[in-house]
Regions:
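Asp-based, Mg2+/Mn2+-dependent phosphohydrolase catalytic module
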Residues: 20, 24, 33-141
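Short, acidic loop-to-helix structural element flanking the phosphoryl-transfer center
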Residues: 3-33, 72
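Extended, well-ordered alpha-helical scaffold segments
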Residues: 1-4, 55
Length: 141
């Protein structure tokens, strides 16, 4: 049953509305790295089927690195793999108040919390309600 469920998860993924267009607009203007705490097999299968995967400069999956968010080492691995030596140039965009934003804080980089549910989370450097607001913040930085 667990194997069937893992297979199902790996073959099904729902894109956030506007995510592909968002990444297409940013592609080439900055490096885009996906950092995931997900299971490697499931995430790789999803990304294999995903239309925006070619827009990513790198993919860092916790189960492949032996460390997961909010541990700052996963962010440091992502920065090193994409050649970012200046943390002031890095921004973590995420919607997890327990993994994404604490990982950014722990790694000493700016963060944008995508507050889909209007939770009012205050630990991030910036807060955005949607991808359009994320894009505005990124392009101003």
């Amino acid at each position: 049953l667990a194997l069937r469920y893992s297979h199902y998860l790996g073959t099904h993924a729902d894109l956030m509305p506007g995510a592909e267009a968002f990444l297409r607009r940013l592609h080439g203007q900055m490096k885009i790295v996906l950092v995931s705490n997900g299971d490697s097999v499931i995430q790789r299968n999803r990304l294999f089927r995903c239309v925006f995967t070619p827009l990513l400069d790198n993919i860092v999956i916790s189960s492949e690195k032996g460390v997961s968010k909010p541990d700052p080492r996963l962010i440091e691995i992502a920065l090193a793999e994409c050649g970012c030596t200046d943390k002031a140039e890095a921004v973590m965009v995420g919607d997890s108040a327990t993994a994404d934003i604490p990982a950014a804080v722990n790694a000493g980089i700016d963060s944008i919390f995508v507050d889909w549910k209007n939770m009012g989370y205050k630990q991030a450097t910036y807060t955005a309600k949607n991808l359009a607001e994320v894009e505005q913040i990124l392009l101003k930085s």
